[in-house]
Amino acid sequence: MLLQMAMDGAADGLTIAEFKEFISNIYDSVDIVEFGTSCVYRFGMEGVQEIKQAFPDKLILADMKIMDGGGHMSRMAYSFGADIVTVLAVSDDATIGNVIGSAHKVNKEVMVDMICVSDIAKRIPEVEKL
């Protein structure tokens, strides 16, 4: 089992330095550091890079909620140190497939976010085929 910690406090005005201090305090207990959507918007890919450089042995999840431009967006996140990116399951199959393809090329991972999916039981096997 892996334990994930979400960094979504950017909306509350927290800084990258404050996030790093918090992660340091729970370092031994967490496996995945989620750089939440609000952090992605506020700090950009440079924020992902700063967290990865500070904690290189932790998995960094960039919660980008990709809807289009899947290949380009995921390649960018991976190049800045993300180990996992999110893509929305409601996006078209080509977008999801492009994110998965980008991940495979650099031995990284994808999390398909089921937010707003009306029939999750139907969508899961569709996504698994990609």
Cite the ranges covered by each PLM segment.
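Conserved N-terminal beta1-alpha1 strand-loop-helix module at the mouth
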Residues: M1-A62, I66-G71
